[in-house]
Amino acid sequence: MSFLYNRLSKKELKKRMFSEVEPRLTLSFYKYFTIKNTQEYRDKIYKNFYKYNILGRIYIATEGINAQISIPKKYYFFIKKFLYHLNSELNNLRINKSLNNEKSFWVLSVKIREKIVQDGITESFFNPNNVGVYIKSKTVNSMLDNKEIIFIDMRNSYEYAIGHFENAIEIKSTTFREQLKNIIPLMSYAKNKKIVMYCTGGIRCEKATAWMRFNGFKNIYHLEGGIIGYVHDARKNGLPILFKGKNFVFDNRMSEKISDEIISYCKQCGQLSDTYVNCQYNLCHLLFIQCANCSVNFKNCCSLNCMKKSSSCCL
């Protein structure tokens, strides 16, 4: 029997996931294309994913689909076949495999959104398909050696903190919408320079590179498949990986280790650390970096105040 919505608690689903022994893959994919009946798409995806024990977070909008999912490994080719039958626009869809296959999701969530990435763009004649030039790891490494070429990280500040390409510019923000608003005046001095943009899996740079070109920037490039695609391609071709630190991911893993360098610091003691946690006090739930010692000393909380409140809640 199939359902259109989850019927179990997150606690039950988490317990079920961690008792599972079947190997899984964490995948991500996106595609900008026109979807006329978003509710029909949403329900069809939920029914089929539920049937095959596929978990994760999927956004559907009239502009396309954006998904991060955890699937039983044996259903990888089913996913590709299902997506093609869902819409021929999804044939030859680029599917990013995660850099590790730790348990990433235990809930299936398929939601209809106004946009698959909230960008704040309201210009009716903006063309999201007028994107930058895709580049792979060999070209990326070569361009990183050229100090005249600018690299821009199109992720949030907390993502940038634990890992990035050396000397990449951080567009400081907590939302993609805010980045797009700020990037044009901030980078106005570089309209005639070569600019390389990157994000986790590529979806934000589809919009970001098109937005830059819309605003008169001509020489715009972006990493095909984002950081994940770059790492896979570099490993496949035996090339050095020049990304430093960890890649932040939006699932229960929090991050994927790419290099041995630790480039971020514990919020509480200032020691090198690259472990993100959420404050144990549920009314706070702040996302922050915490080292192992402070995790013990503060009982997984972000402050003494939250530690006291969390302890009183448990009495």
Task: Briefly describe each language-model feature range.
Residues 2-133, 156-194, 203-315:
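Rhodanese-like catalytic fold shared by cysteine-dependent sulfurtransferases
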Residues 131-146:
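Internal catalytic-core helix/loop-beta-alpha segment
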Residues 145-148, 191-192:
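Short, well-ordered loop/turn elements at secondary-structure boundaries
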Residues 148-155:
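Short hydrophobic beta-strand that contains or immediately precedes a catalytic carboxylate
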Residues 200:
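Substrate-contacting helices/loops that form the catalytic groove of nucleic-acid
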